[in-house]
Amino acid sequence: MLHALLQPASAYAVVLDAGSSGTRAHVFRFQARPGHTPMLLAKPSVLKHSPGLSAFADQPAKAARQVEALIHWAQTLVPAGQRRDTPVVLLATAGLRLLAAQRGEAAAEAVLDACRPVLIDSQFLFRDDWAHILPGADEGAFAWAR
């Protein structure tokens, strides 16, 4: 038992970066040990689907289908036993910010609202507020993920 406590465990995180040209799923794998800072084990696995979610403003269900395809791919990388402990976030950037500016917040929120049920049903750890439009000032803080 002591040996198991000393062994670092793998932990995962899934970040959906919904940009203007497409949505990228980033699957991060960390070394996690209680009391230690998690360490990234390798470059994240990344898959991009185009176009950006804002292209589906008039058909939000298509945005949900795009997110669903990315989630299915991420599920192949995260062991089934770890999915419930793996957070998934959907961070929308320039495309949905522009949609909100041009057609109103409700148009952008409708796209996110269509995607939330996919994330809830994904087997990953998700809360509704983890799918949101990232303010431009905060976007730079996530540049390391690209």
Predicted regions located by residue number:
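Nucleotide/phosphate-binding catalytic cleft detector across ATP-hydrolyzing
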Residues: 1-20, 26-146
